[in-house]
């Protein structure tokens, strides 16, 4: 069976990003975005998704982190879409409820090729450090470019870092379920016959 993998490059006046994904070959993640907090979240995603994942990214972070975070989401989404391919034999759906200390987050997704994002996370504004509002921008960009229906809900939580960590880990775990093979590796999981 052909390996499900992709390599996508995105180069604009604002960012330069290369993403490699291999759904069938688990490698140690290689993450370098010049944004320490984003690196940490993407490493968590990669480890918990169980996929081969590499990203090298740079951009105009002297302005702020928005362009790089959003473009990383775009590029990862495009790579996921290409790697998943025709979706024959995949489970298609995934969901995970993940605790992280005082935080509890739930992620559910569908790889049907239709974009939708529901994002409910009560993350408090923080004057210094990472702009946590960019997490929603990241997942919007990723889901819209991958064609994923994605529901993210923080059920409870107090610490911004823990909330973000639980969301990225839960997303990785839900994606792991969705891209795994079902017992019938030859059919597309839809009554339409295609996704």
Curated annotation (Swiss-Prot):
Q: What is the lineage of its organism?
A: Bacteria, Pseudomonadati, Elusimicrobiota, Endomicrobiia, Endomicrobiales
Q: Which PANTHER family match?
A: IMIDAZOLEGLYCEROL-PHOSPHATE DEHYDRATASE (PTHR23133:SF2), IMIDAZOLEGLYCEROL-PHOSPHATE DEHYDRATASE HIS7 (PTHR23133)
Q: Give the UniProt subcellular location, in the record's own words.
A: Cytoplasm
Give the matching PROSITE patterns: IGP_DEHYDRATASE_1 (PS00954), IGP_DEHYDRATASE_2 (PS00955)
Catalyzed reactions per annotation: D-erythro-1-(imidazol-4-yl)glycerol 3-phosphate = 3-(imidazol-4-yl)-2-oxopropyl phosphate + H2O
Pfam families attached here?
IGPD
Query: What is a single molecular function from GO for this protein?
Result: imidazoleglycerol-phosphate dehydratase activity
| Protein name per the record | Imidazoleglycerol-phosphate dehydratase
Q: HAMAP family, per this entry? A: HisB
Homology family: Belongs to the imidazoleglycerol-phosphate dehydratase family.
InterPro entries in the cross-refs: IGPD_sf (IPR038494), ImidazoleglycerolP_deHydtase (IPR000807), ImidazoleglycerP_deHydtase_CS (IPR020565), Ribosomal_Su5_D2-typ_SF (IPR020568)
Q: Gene3D superfamilies from the entry?
A: Imidazole glycerol phosphate dehydratase, domain 1
Quote the EC number: 4.2.1.19
Which pathway does the protein contribute to? Amino-acid biosynthesis; L-histidine biosynthesis; L-histidine from 5-phospho-alpha-D-ribose 1-diphosphate: step 6/9
What superkingdom does the record give? Bacteria
Lyase as a keyword?
yes
- Biological process (GO), any one: L-histidine biosynthetic process
Sorted alphabetically, the keyword list is:
Amino-acid biosynthesis, Cytoplasm, Histidine biosynthesis, Lyase
- Main localization, broad class: cytoplasm
Would you name any one GO CC term? cytoplasm
């Amino acid at each position: 069976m052909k390996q499900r993998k992709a390599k996508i490059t995105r180069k604009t006046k604002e960012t330069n990003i290369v993403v490699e994904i291999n759904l069938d070959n688990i490698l140690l993640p290689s993450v370098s975005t010049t944004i320490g907090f984003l690196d940490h979240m993407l490493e968590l995603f990669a480890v918990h998704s169980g996929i081969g994942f590499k990203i090298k990214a740079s951009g105009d972070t002297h302005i702020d982190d928005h362009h790089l975070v959003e473009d990383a989401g775009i590029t990862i989404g495009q790579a996921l879409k290409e790697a998943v391919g025709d979706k024959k034999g995949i489970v298609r759906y995934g969901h995970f409820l993940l605790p992280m200390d005082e935080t509890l987050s739930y992620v559910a997704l569908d790889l049907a090729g239709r974009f939708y994002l529901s994002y409910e996370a009560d993350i408090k504004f923080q004057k210094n450090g990472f702009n946590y509002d960019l997490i929603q921008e990241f997942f919007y960009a990723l889901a819209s470019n991958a064609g994923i229906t994605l529901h993210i809900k923080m059920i409870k939580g107090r610490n911004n870092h823990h909330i973000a960590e639980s969301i990225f880990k839960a997303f990785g775990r839900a994606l792991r379920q969705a891209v795994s093979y079902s017992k019938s590796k030859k059919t597309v999981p839809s009554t339409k016959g295609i996704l």
